[in-house]
Protein backbone atom coordinates (compact mmCIF):
# COMPACT_ATOMS: atom_id res chain seq x y z
CA UNK A 1 0.00 0.00 0.00
CA UNK A 2 1.52 3.33 -1.08
CA UNK A 3 -1.32 5.57 0.09
CA UNK A 4 0.09 8.92 1.16
CA UNK A 5 3.60 8.05 -0.04
CA UNK A 6 5.28 10.17 -2.67
CA UNK A 7 5.18 7.50 -5.35
CA UNK A 8 8.06 8.92 -7.37
CA UNK A 9 10.34 7.77 -4.56
CA UNK A 10 9.79 4.28 -5.94
CA UNK A 11 11.34 3.94 -9.42
CA UNK A 12 8.60 1.72 -10.78
CA UNK A 13 6.13 4.58 -10.29
CA UNK A 14 8.22 7.33 -11.93
CA UNK A 15 7.42 8.20 -15.51
CA UNK A 16 11.06 9.00 -16.31
CA UNK A 17 12.83 6.12 -14.55
CA UNK A 18 14.24 4.83 -17.84
CA UNK A 19 16.15 8.08 -18.47
CA UNK A 20 16.76 9.42 -14.95
CA UNK A 21 18.57 6.70 -13.05
CA UNK A 22 21.98 5.67 -11.73
CA UNK A 23 23.06 4.08 -15.02
CA UNK A 24 22.25 7.27 -16.94
CA UNK A 25 24.23 9.33 -14.40
CA UNK A 26 27.26 7.07 -14.73
CA UNK A 27 27.08 7.27 -18.53
CA UNK A 28 26.94 11.10 -18.51
CA UNK A 29 30.28 12.80 -17.70
CA UNK A 30 28.35 16.02 -16.91
CA UNK A 31 25.98 14.41 -14.40
CA UNK A 32 25.55 15.43 -10.77
CA UNK A 33 27.40 12.25 -9.81
CA UNK A 34 30.61 13.39 -11.52
CA UNK A 35 30.23 16.97 -10.28
CA UNK A 36 30.17 15.64 -6.72
CA UNK A 37 33.19 13.44 -7.43
CA UNK A 38 35.08 16.51 -8.66
CA UNK A 39 34.03 18.47 -5.58
CA UNK A 40 35.30 15.72 -3.28
CA UNK A 41 38.66 15.70 -5.12
CA UNK A 42 38.83 19.50 -4.92
CA UNK A 43 38.13 19.42 -1.19
CA UNK A 44 41.26 17.31 -0.73
CA UNK A 45 43.44 19.90 -2.50
CA UNK A 46 41.89 23.19 -1.30
CA UNK A 47 41.92 23.60 2.47
CA UNK A 48 39.77 26.72 2.16
CA UNK A 49 36.82 24.49 1.19
CA UNK A 50 36.85 23.00 4.67
CA UNK A 51 38.56 25.50 6.95
CA UNK A 52 38.45 29.22 7.55
CA UNK A 53 35.95 32.01 7.90
CA UNK A 54 32.57 31.57 6.23
CA UNK A 55 30.58 34.60 5.05
CA UNK A 56 27.10 34.19 3.59
CA UNK A 57 26.86 36.82 0.84
CA UNK A 58 23.09 36.61 0.20
CA UNK A 59 21.51 35.15 3.35
CA UNK A 60 17.96 36.10 2.39
CA UNK A 61 17.93 35.19 -1.30
CA UNK A 62 15.37 32.45 -1.98
CA UNK A 63 17.23 30.88 -4.92
CA UNK A 64 20.93 31.72 -4.66
CA UNK A 65 23.43 30.32 -2.20
CA UNK A 66 26.50 32.54 -2.35
CA UNK A 67 29.34 32.53 0.13
CA UNK A 68 32.98 33.39 0.62
CA UNK A 69 35.54 31.50 2.70
CA UNK A 70 39.01 32.66 3.66
CA UNK A 71 41.83 30.54 5.05
CA UNK A 72 45.60 31.01 5.14
CA UNK A 73 45.79 33.44 2.23
CA UNK A 74 43.23 31.65 0.05
CA UNK A 75 39.79 33.01 -0.76
CA UNK A 76 37.01 30.86 -2.14
CA UNK A 77 33.83 32.32 -3.61
CA UNK A 78 30.92 30.04 -4.42
CA UNK A 79 27.68 30.90 -6.16
CA UNK A 80 24.95 28.34 -6.72
CA UNK A 81 21.56 28.74 -8.33
CA UNK A 82 19.20 26.35 -6.54
CA UNK A 83 16.26 26.93 -8.86
CA UNK A 84 14.86 25.92 -12.24
CA UNK A 85 14.98 29.56 -13.41
CA UNK A 86 17.89 31.78 -14.42
CA UNK A 87 19.04 34.06 -11.60
CA UNK A 88 20.94 37.35 -11.77
CA UNK A 89 23.99 37.58 -9.51
CA UNK A 90 25.96 40.70 -8.65
CA UNK A 91 29.08 39.83 -6.65
CA UNK A 92 30.85 41.93 -4.11
CA UNK A 93 33.75 43.76 -5.79
CA UNK A 94 36.82 41.53 -6.18
CA UNK A 95 40.43 42.24 -7.01
CA UNK A 96 43.40 40.11 -7.90
CA UNK A 97 43.82 36.91 -9.85
CA UNK A 98 41.03 34.34 -9.68
CA UNK A 99 40.53 30.97 -11.31
CA UNK A 100 37.56 28.67 -11.71
CA UNK A 101 38.16 25.72 -9.41
CA UNK A 102 34.98 23.88 -10.41
CA UNK A 103 31.77 24.44 -12.33
CA UNK A 104 28.94 22.23 -13.45
CA UNK A 105 28.56 24.15 -16.73
CA UNK A 106 31.12 24.94 -19.40
CA UNK A 107 31.96 28.51 -20.40
CA UNK A 108 31.92 30.36 -17.10
CA UNK A 109 33.61 33.67 -16.24
CA UNK A 110 37.21 33.26 -15.11
CA UNK A 111 36.56 35.47 -12.06
CA UNK A 112 33.52 36.41 -9.98
CA UNK A 113 31.56 38.87 -12.09
CA UNK A 114 27.96 39.87 -12.71
CA UNK A 115 26.23 37.05 -14.50
CA UNK A 116 22.94 35.38 -15.23
CA UNK A 117 23.21 31.95 -13.63
CA UNK A 118 21.65 29.09 -15.50
CA UNK A 119 19.29 26.65 -13.73
CA UNK A 120 21.14 24.76 -10.99
CA UNK A 121 24.46 26.29 -12.04
CA UNK A 122 27.23 26.36 -9.44
CA UNK A 123 30.68 27.92 -9.72
CA UNK A 124 33.61 27.73 -7.29
CA UNK A 125 36.31 30.41 -7.76
CA UNK A 126 39.56 30.53 -5.82
CA UNK A 127 42.04 33.34 -5.29
CA UNK A 128 45.48 32.44 -3.96
Predicted regions span which residues?
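Solvent-exposed beta-hairpin/edge-strand motifs
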Residues: 93-105
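Glycan-recognition and catalytic regions of carbohydrate-active enzymes
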Residues: 13-76
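C-terminal beta-strand-rich structural cap/linker in extracellular carbohydrate-active enzymes
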Residues: 10, 111-128
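Hydrophobic, well-ordered secondary-structure elements that form the walls
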Residues: 39, 79-81, 120
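Single conserved hydrophobic/aromatic residue that forms the stacking wall/gate
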Residues: 1-8
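Surface-exposed beta-strand/loop patches in extracellular or lumenal glycoproteins
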Residues: 82-95
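Residues that act as N-cap/strand-start positions at coil-to-secondary-structure junctions
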Residues: 61-63, 83, 109-111
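Residues immediately flanking
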Residues: 81-82, 127
